[in-house]
A protein has these predicted regions:
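Flexible, solvent-exposed loop/hinge segments and secondary-structure transition points
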Residues: 19-128, 133-138, 142-155
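Bacterial N-terminal signal peptides that target proteins for export
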Residues: 1-9
């Protein structure tokens, strides 16, 4: 066997087996805002990563953009809170891992609706674990809990 083959074959095998990370943007910030607050006619920036959703002069709630680490890479997500600090909606905007994307499923994200800063929010408790996306589901749950702790009393 030539030196060239002996040196490149192991690298080629590793490259063919390793799964690449896939960065997929599912929603823009603007699209997620409109999904969360369809009656809003403006979003006023609040602190650089959150916006007050308004219909005229009426405050509808707060839209918060955040990110957490999945297993190795960032997950960008958004949480919409009503004026009482309750979760109205959670959306995954961008998922970069090559597996574990089940955290995007609407049935899983719907578990957060109605939660407040006093909710337990525990994977394996009031939030289902996703087999194959254990760390992603854990970290998104922790992120939503952090958003509620920081913004849940924005009134």
């Amino acid at each position: 066997m030539t030196d060239w083959v002996r040196l490149t074959l192991p690298a080629a095998l590793v490259a063919s087996i390793a799964s690449p990370a896939l960065a997929v943007q599912y929603l823009s910030v603007e699209a997620a805002q409109k999904l969360a607050f369809p009656s809003a006619n403006r979003f006023v920036e609040y602190d650089g990563k959150s916006w007050k959703a308004q219909a005229g002069d009426k405050l509808l709630g707060l839209f918060v953009l955040d990110h957490v680490i999945g297993k190795h890479l960032y997950i960008d997500y958004a949480v919409a809170l009503d004026t009482n600090g309750r979760v109205m909606r959670v959306e995954i905007l961008q998922y970069r891992e090559s597996y574990g994307g089940e955290v995007r499923e609407s049935s899983w994200l719907a578990q957060f609706v109605g939660k407040t800063s006093s909710s337990v929010l525990k994977v394996g408790g009031d939030i289902r674990t996703i087999s194959g996306a254990t760390l992603s589901s854990l970290h998104v749950t922790e992120g939503v809990k952090r958003v509620l702790a920081n913004y849940g009393s924005h009134r």
